């Protein structure tokens, strides 16, 4: 018996030792703000203790330590305390800072560490970059899979074809986690904006309205149409509510909420509070079959955690589920360790001592855990070589619309780490939602956009016009119907003092109409409260004005030149004439002192002016001019007249061939500078606000709009403005009033006017346009915009424009019946050069005349010899008598007449005694001459001769001696000087038959006949 006892004692001791080692002690560290981690951990240990399939006789004990959030020092202290108690593994659920500190400790002590990362404040988590172990042995295992949100978001924006969007994140989110996403988005050419959201979300939106202008808010609203929210569910709900309340969100906005942890009730809250489309990305776990929903690997899970009807599961966070599966993974490893009988006893470790050695069973326990494979609440869990759990799956939910249930959520696709995206994220075409719908349309009568076509009693009004045609084309393409009615006040929409809106805009804001269409322009103020489609027609402001009446002028031939030019030309004619007269008088005085010549044709004032006028009209009339001064004067005058006549001809041709409306007002600048005509627009209209904004802008350098606004806003607009466009058109037709309004409207009024009495001028350049107004946040805006662009591409809009604004209508705006010459009269400054040329010529002529007078007077005084006297007629008579006395017996003069020319002879000195004149009756020779300035009649002498007498001189009645001019005495002394201003005086001799002249003339005489 004793021998049997001794033989069984070692076995009994071994069994006792195994039973003692079968008590499994686990340490746990949680943050104090995670109360559910503690409860779930205890629930997991309780479930495993009751499961005999995993641990038959083994019992799990645990020690839990609670630390502050993000306190690594406290985490290390509590972990050392647990190691002193002796633990087989450490399970933690903390942030990244505490996890890094615990990793270093567990790596040094060889204690397996199962780490579950928590979401910071419910915000999306970012990856924890754990420090690698120096010896390459990492004892920390990440139970929760790495963050894959960047991959999901990149695939999502790619599927949605976003090119520009904004990402909002809160203070709890580590923006460094987006670095990889931003790098990939940059390579794809995406425009990504980041904006941090403070905890006081209402303050964020309030600051936007205080720091941004209206244009900036409109751009910010466009940015919000595509947004990704990296916020907590509560933060996202508050953010969307503020965006909707401040009218920064619209029905065509698309919100993408990305967070691994969000419950179904939270999703529904987001969907119902948001305007537009909502997409939610969250992590999901595979659901088990109904008969196995509470069983995982033969492990019975508490119904609180596996039965959705209990409701407790919906309240758990993802970190709680991974914490439960981490305990299950440890229990599975302990079970396999016990089966393999490779159990290592727990050891008390003192991490403060330097001599403390790590647990020798840590490596074996770590390998067993890493080889484990379980299926828990989160699905499959196992660890790869990098100590991470790779299995993760995401669900992508999207909003749906229905007539019965309104807005709801449906599953669009899933994403997992192995297969990627499974499903389609493309938005369902919105056009299908309009099929069969009836929209309420509000409008305002405005020709030719909207007009009443028929008005039958008892039936709704029928409308026609350009905007109605566009609406019909959209209804046909999209398959919807519409009911149209007029705005009660007949206005487009203007913000009142109480911040409310009237007109069509007010109808949209109050939800009484789905859309508004007419000649409504897209303005920043209107776009802040309603949405607009793409413009279907450009907009500009024009001036409707009455055409000027036709003016007939019989003096239009004077139009090519300005009055000052005509005055200068009229003054130049007598000035030049007087100068020519003076020059001729000077020349005549000089000539009288020598020969007393006959006055020239320009010696009188009226004759000189007549010569000038003849040259001006290019008809001649001037006598021969030999003086240098006269030639300079006439040359300058001829050049002057050539330029003047050529310019007159060219400009007159321009006046006759180029003609258009001669209206003094052609631009807004012309309108602002005149005061004879009043002008205005419709009060409280878009045009009214346009001039107000331009006229009151201190940065506007052009003062034109400021002057226009002063006139338009006089007396609050009551003096010059009208209440409706039709009133303004009627007022412009009456005359003396310019109506400023949309070019499209006033052009139609001018084209269809019965009298064609008005025209449109002064188009302004504007970036505005006519669009379709919809309720703020309407989901149909993009659909209408797309169809409008299609109508533009196909040319259908151009066809509709030609229908209502024909190029050849009743009135032609390109030509006018009252067209007048549009050329410009040449001003005096344009002719200053030619008048300068004339003045220089006249001055030069005066100078030359003075020099010529001085030169000739001095030269004649010095060079005239005493013996070189000009013979007069008496000398000729005496010479002829002497010749006849000497040779009368045998010299005869031919019966032909003898003409003596080239004898411009001056008289002798008054004191000289003349020889008596002898008569030769028998020769019957007649001598005739004309003496200028001495007498007004001719003097003749007759010499008689016998009929048989002959003169052997080569003279005949038909022969004329050439005229001669001499300034020096000839060698034979027979030539006389002739004054350059005197004309040759012919002398005729009529011989009588029987007269005999001497046979030859004495060459010694100084008279030539």
UniProtKB/Swiss-Prot annotation:
One of its GO terms (cellular component) is GABA-ergic synapse. Belongs to the glutamate-gated ion channel (TC 1.A.10.1) family. GRID1 subfamily. It catalyses: Ca(2+)(in) = Ca(2+)(out); Na(+)(in) = Na(+)(out). Its main location: membrane. The chain crosses the membrane at residues 563-583, 638-658, 831-851. The keyword Iron does not apply. It comes from Homo sapiens. This is Glutamate receptor ionotropic, delta-1.
